[in-house]
């Protein structure tokens, strides 16, 4: 028996069905202690990061159609968004501030999960949360990567030096 499954699936399809059919239980679990829902315990950082992700999708979709991803036009398209597009400056600011907040909230969420030990096995039999921790680390790295790439999009002097420093760190 696989120690990572509380359910012992007989096939890959049954395992996949178990994951997809129980996905909603993550958002609406059957048992939740009052202590885990207290503001001073969780600070609702996971919910806030999900809300910020939704904000970034909603503010990023219009920017996706307005931005021109070329070395020659990147800076000019940012200026067009700022000064020509109606509410463009506001939209870009909402997206930028949301991205900064997302990095901070996701990092705080990681620290909170680590300090409270929420990544360890749950109270029920067969609840293995180590995979949740690994998925959280992957999502943190993805958040940092996307934040870095968004930082480069204007392709101005600041972005140029960010690429220079980033590639030097990577090498």
What are these regions (language model features)?
Residues 1-171:
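Membrane-embedded alpha-helical bundles that constitute the cytochrome b-like, heme-associated redox core
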